[in-house]
Amino acid sequence: FDQIISKLAEDKNFVVAFNEVYPDGLNEKNITNAIQEFEKTLLTPNSRFDRYLKGQKDAITADEIAGYDLFKKYDCATCHVGEILGGQSYELIGVQHDYFADRQAEMTEEDNGRFKQTKAERDRHRFKVPGLRNIELTAPYFHDGSMATMDDAVRAMAKYQLGIDLPQP
């Protein structure tokens, strides 16, 4: 958590705003609580997508329907499940291709994923699957922030998890 605190502390405006809410400042407990409170705002029980799932076929656009069809076609719901479309399991990154070799960056402690907590070798490079509700608001993506856009993240997931190179739009 020291790396996270150091990174956050670099943004002086963030620190001022954070300290207004958490007077005892940046620490693991407060950061974890802030993330939990933020995640509560991501639930959208009556979104257009929810209405579509409940049978209102005109609630989303034709492009959005096509995207959802691809989501199902490529079995994204295998990991992105439940009301928030994820957040319920830890999965390995790089099932089909070596994400870390391709990234061409020095390995960090955070790259170990769940292993950092469990020390179980099976958890090395295993990360919590993010929920997809309001995901467009949470860039950059991946545990290391290496994917700047949703398009980058989707293409990377297709490559590293499924072994598929998605065509350009």
Question: Which role does the model predict for each range below?
Answer:
Residues F1-P169:
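Periplasmic c-type cytochrome electron-transfer domains
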